[in-house]
Amino acid sequence: MIKVLFVCHGNICRSPMAEFILKDMARRAGVGQNFEVASAAVSCEELGNPVYPPARRELAKHGISCSGKTARQVTPADYAHYDRIYYMDRSNARYLARMLPADPEKIRPLLDRDVADPWYTGDFTQTYEDLAEGCRKILEEF
């Protein structure tokens, strides 16, 4: 079982989108049972809130549901539990460096560039495409 945690600022846009994109891709590839996938925030600003409506709509356009997902914050227990922790941008990396042990094999960027935060850009389609690119790479790696 490969355990993957996606992390972004608030756990209402990018990281839950990545969580459900990877779950969907793994299921469609017939390897869903080989993955445990979750997401979390580096901040506590959105704790308990559902996925942001435009992010839900973008996932729904691709036939993906994120029903029931609520924001939670990353914890030290996540470091012990997950095999890989993928962050979305350099700001997330700085927060994680204060929260978890340094471990570049386990904690790494999803892409070789920042995944723009659609909370600010409003471009949920581009975010979806970037996240799908990163999730495809994860599937290829494992």
Which residues are covered by each model-predicted region?
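Conserved active-site segments centered on acidic
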Residues: M1-Y79, F142
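Phosphate-binding/catalytic loops
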Residues: D78, R84, M88-F142
